Amino acid sequence: MIITTLTCMCVDIFDNTIMPGGESLNFAATISRLTDAKVYIIGAVGNDSYGKTVLDSIKDFSIDKTHIRTENGDTASNRTYLTPDGDRYYKDDSWNGGVFSSFALSASDRELLHSSDMVHTTFSGPNFNDVISCCREKRFPLSVDFDICRDFDTIEKYLDCISLLFISGDKPTLEKAKRLSAKYTDTVFIVTLGENGSTAFSKGTAYHCAAAEVSEVTDTTGCGDSYQAGFIASYLADGNIETAMSKGSQTAAQTLSFIGGFRY
């Protein structure tokens, strides 16, 4: 089995601490510990010290790195701030996209997508439309993190391609996800609700999972990526939505206990 994720790899810059991160890096590092599948990352880092930090962080992980390119320029970086309760937040000038912003898929990258048993990406990434095009050319299971997107008219345009849809939500999001799940019966909609757990919809049926208990929240960075990794690893193993939600919740709870998106 092949699981491929793309495209964001970056460093998260905290006060006095630089941590490897980005949705794809967090996801790959986490899911590689939960499955025997072959895990690939497609993306790029810059030829700078941050790029070395990213690559060094996953050198001992069971991740295939042949589709990670080192390009001239800056590795993407995100200046990350934490509230006293451990919730992360950003400022207008936090993000530097670096080589991530201009990354383009190669022919080899496209071939990998077509041979994957699950591809996981983000709606906000620069290669999202290319991934959709690849999927329409030759179908593969596709998981997409829509994060806080609320433009459901736009989301609906892509649902013919999406197997698993993750979105951070609220009550109106739940209502729209339920409606769409009855229409797009090949897509499982997973709405994460923070401390209120998560709700999934499949063919109009709702499934709810409470958040796993956490004694103390250190940092919420990478929590969503960990949930998605746990969910997908479990779902690919047995196709059970409720079991997958529970695994996602447990995996996210572990990530809340340390600084950064994954341990290395």
Model-found features: residue ranges?
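Ribokinase/PfkB-type carbohydrate-kinase core domain
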Residues: 1-4, 57-59, 65-68, 82-207, ...
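Substrate-binding N-lobe of the ribokinase-like
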Residues: 2, 12-78, 84-85
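Active-site metal-binding loops of divalent metal-dependent hydrolases
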Residues: 7-9, 170, 226
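A short, flexible beta-alpha/helix-coil linker loop
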Residues: 10-13, 214-216
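Residues at secondary-structure transition points
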Residues: 18-22, 49, 153, 218, ...
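Conserved sugar-transfer catalytic core signal across GT-A, GT-B, and GT-C glycosyltransferases
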Residues: 23, 27, 131, 216
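Active-site catalytic pocket residues across diverse enzymes, especially alpha/beta-hydrolases
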Residues: 35, 135, 235
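Conserved phosphate-binding/catalytic region of the ribokinase-like
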Residues: 178-264
